[in-house]
Amino acid sequence: MPVIKVRENESFDVALRRFKRSCEKAGLLAEVRAREFYEKPTTIRKREKASLAKRHAKRNARENARNTRLY
């Protein structure tokens, strides 16, 4: 869990913003959302495989667009 020390003469808003930023960097919110409900290992693998396929398709589309002649 991210911990921050409130500096002298630091407003609450600034300290809260620093805490939120440190939580975001640590990936705390994403971890909580991922663990909110149980997800079967097969579902996890399926989701990761789908995201990998999407990433590859995106990369291939960019490569094809780059190699297409415009004239």
Curated annotation (Swiss-Prot):
Assigned keywords, A-Z: Ribonucleoprotein, Ribosomal protein
Start and end residues of each stretch annotated as Disordered: 48-71
Residue stretches of biased makeup (Basic residues)? 48-59
Q: Which GO terms describe its cellular component?
A: ribonucleoprotein complex; ribosome
Gene Ontology biological process terms, A to Z: translation
Q: Which residues form a coiled coil?
A: none
Provide ranges: composition bias, Basic and acidic residues.
Answer: 60-71
- Highest taxon of the source? Bacteria
Keyword Ribosomal protein among UniProt keywords: yes
- Residues spanning the signal sequence: none
The Swiss-Prot or TrEMBL record annotates one GO molecular function as: structural constituent of ribosome
What's the family? Belongs to the bacterial ribosomal protein bS21 family.
Which NCBIfam families does the entry mention? Answer: S21p
Query: Could you tell me what this protein is called?
Result: Small ribosomal subunit protein bS21
Q: What organism is recorded for this protein?
A: Actinobacillus pleuropneumoniae serotype 5b (strain L20)
Gene that specifies this protein:
rpsU
